[in-house]
Amino acid sequence: MKLYSWNVNGLRACMNKGFADFLAAANPDVICLQETKMQREQATFDFPGYEEYWNSAEKKGYSGTAIFTKQAPLNVTYDIGIEEHDKEGRVITAEYPDFFLVTVYTPNSQRELARLDYRMVWEEVFLAYLQKLDAIKPVVVCGDLNVAAEEIDLKNPKTNRMNAGFTDQEREKFRIFKAAGFVDTFRYLHPEEVKYSWWSYMFKAREKNAGWRIDYFMVSERIKDKVKSAEIHNDVFGSDHCPVSVELEL
């Protein structure tokens, strides 16, 4: 089963930059999107062969997630069931026979860490949500987690030490996430590889490959050996992020 995840930074904008051609060429069984930045009723496009599940933020043009899947899930739920965390369209869970697929757009801690306190609360409640699912069947979590886990995961770790996405607090929450039994598939299969999934639009960052790896596929520890590949598709344009993927044999 071939799964892709991509923060498209606005699906309508990405459609104008080749999203449909990318989808046809990659031909994933499932693709999860973050930062769709639209309501489903605004879509003037559809994707034949895929069932579509959308979770949009209450605030128009902000956040939002979607799952497009060839195989109809057994069940689909939206958000995590806690009202204060369920207004921004950040989570969709699709249940398949052998696993839960959860796509997430983790809240950004923002400039001057204005939202870091909220982010810390989010990390705890989201992990608790995943652990409940994991008690039922294995979990595959994908999306923009808004954290570079280690120094290898960003071009300039020293100068970004106190910036959103690389604070000690965010990295500690990621360590706790892994310690709870979730495996970073790319790092598991590529322990030393330097590859990024996001580049600022400023300073010609992508041209210089001054990026961050903040988009992930995480899996329950007990299915890590079912992951046959984990890739970062940094040759695909259309957003400030690039797609990431895994192939699972379940």
What are these model-predicted stretches?
Residues 37, 43-109:
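Structured beta-strand-rich core segments of catalytic domains in phosphoester-bond hydrolases
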Residues 51, 124-210, 214:
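Metal-dependent phosphoesterases centered on the DNase I-like endonuclease/exonuclease/phosphatase
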Residues 60-75, 193, 205-225:
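Conserved beta strand-loop-helix elements of the APE1-like EEP
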Residues 81-82, 107-123, 158-162:
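Surface-exposed cleft-lining segments at the edges of enzyme active sites
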Residues 1-47, 51, 57-63, 78, ...:
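N-terminal, active-site-proximal structural segment of metallo-dependent hydrolase catalytic domains
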Residues 7, 23-41, 101, 130-151, ...:
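Active-site beta-strand/loop signature of hydrolases that rely on acidic residues for catalysis
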Residues 1-9, 98-110, 142:
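Active-site-proximal beta-strand elements of phosphoester/diester hydrolases
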Residues 70, 94-97, 220-221, 246-250:
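Active-site beta-strand termini and strand-to-loop segments that position acidic
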